[in-house]
């Protein structure tokens, strides 16, 4: 029988500069815009340039067809470490855990973990249409 695995602690990793952009029920802006706004607030709060961010974790359901890699170019980032986590409410926790491990491994020094979506007039219906086969079966 194998010995139980002992998880490594998160010592030496710091989570700082939490940012929250005020909620708007409906918006004509894209999720990309909201994520960019959050990233700007994060960089300002940390007192750094966005160019110093060398890790980027993004969570969103409404940036399609773009993913985190496309957004890095749009936002002027050049990360050494990149993650796209489209898993809904648990994405924030996953982003922080993965980012912490990336810092511990030396893959990045400063990781921005951002999430953003938008709710335009038809967003909910379009999201359900393409969310999953299970959602399609339940809705149609």
Show where each model-derived region lies:
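Conserved "HGTGT" condensation-loop signature of ketosynthase/thiolase-family condensing enzymes
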Residues: 1-87, 101-105, 112-140
């Amino acid at each position: 029988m194998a010995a139980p695995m002992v998880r490594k602690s998160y010592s030496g990793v710091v989570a700082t500069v939490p940012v929250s952009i005020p909620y708007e029920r409906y918006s004509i802006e894209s999720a990309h815009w909201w994520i960019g706004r959050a990233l700007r607030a994060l960089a300002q709060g940390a007192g750094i340039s966005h160019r110093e961010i060398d890790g980027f974790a993004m969570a969103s359901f409404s940036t399609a067809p773009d993913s985190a890699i496309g957004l890095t170019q749009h936002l002027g980032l050049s990360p050494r470490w990149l993650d796209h986590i489209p898993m809904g409410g648990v994405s924030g926790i996953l982003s922080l855990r993965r980012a912490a491990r990336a810092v511990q491994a030396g893959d990045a020094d400063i990781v921005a973990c951002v999430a953003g979506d938008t709710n335009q007039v038809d967003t909910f219906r379009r999201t359900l249409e393409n969310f999953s086969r299970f959602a399609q079966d339940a809705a149609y």
